[in-house]
């Protein structure tokens, strides 16, 4: 089934392997597509490469439970939502819990940094929609870094379509996490 309600538990190493499978699949598709199709494949490949870099920041045996598994119909296997995986990796680095990290469901925010609710958004190649949140901060992981944006400032970071940037600075850069994710090379 192709639904965000599907949940998957895998190790970081297994998720890295899924990224490799998707890169191989996109490379096969790219060879048969027109210019627009090749461009879409190239974006998907870049996204998977960034995700691999982020996954390499945690031990391969770290277990993650994520929502948003989809793509069974076209792939023959499931691929998790990239944002859910990134959220788990962020939680791994910012919380005490280092085993069985899970994406949170239905709380109005993704996790708390101390007592401050925080919403995690991911925009590695295409822009994430800046949705309203109860959280005081948005933690944006994009292709050029990890950014902390105050709730009142989120809308000043979006483009005309209300999307957060994938290749621009946005808010206050969290240098140590950006470097750990390999996002300091852009």
Language model features: what each stretch is:
Residues 1-186:
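Nucleic-acid endonuclease domains
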